[in-house]
Amino acid sequence: MKKRTGRKVITVILVVIVCMFALFPFVWMISTSFKTAGEVYSKTPSFIPKAATMQGYKEMLTTHSTTFNFMQWLGNSVIVSLLTTAFSMIIATLGGYGISRFRFRGRGFLSYFILTTQVLPGSLLIIPLYVIMGNLQLLDTKIGLVAAYCTFSIPFCTWMMKGFFDTIPISLEEAARVDVAGRFRIFATVILPLTVPGLVATGIFSFINGWNEYLFASTFMKSYENWTLPIGIASFSGQYATNWGTLMAGAVLITLPVVIMFLLLQKHLVSGMTAGAVKQ
């Protein structure tokens, strides 16, 4: 009993240490966003703001110029993220269902090939995509950025949905065919309602990819009015000086939608991420 209690205590301590280590940057970000410029550059930094201020948030939300417009960048990020999520979910759902249910030559190779693409860094696609989008005149456009994001979100979402479809018994579809239901009707009315956790997981994955991505956006988007939030917030860091309070306020505003989405959908997200790993 003493050994078990000791192990539990050690486990709890280790978990607390890991959580503190992981959460510290976020807590420090929130704390800094409420500090004054003098307190940020103080020789003795404080964890809790001595004179909390909302000036950073006010500057971030109300500053409008030819080179800085938070609300416009927010709209661009929402549009790009939602379109990326919609296209990725539609294609990944149909592709995952096809690979899971249909038997064809090269099916196994295709499944592993899709998974292998996630091993390669996204930076390898920048030059080919830049050339292709330049030829198609899609550079500095939202639809071009959405297409770029889909290139690395669709493969993983397809693989994840395929694993989720594998857990749904084929007998359900066979029973529906007895009622003379077509394949598309079976897919829409029988299969899809059972894949809600998987759809939520792929949707959140695609949305976060589009919402947080910086490298592709900074490469393909050149006009200030077409920037997304990660590029816009990064531009707030000057060459000679940086207003860290305002910068951290922007970082908090970017993080909030993702945190809220996770808190609201965490039940479906966890079940969706794990269901495909167990074959029934």
Residue ranges and their predicted role:
Residues 2-280:
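A structural signal for multi-pass alpha-helical bundles of membrane permease subunits
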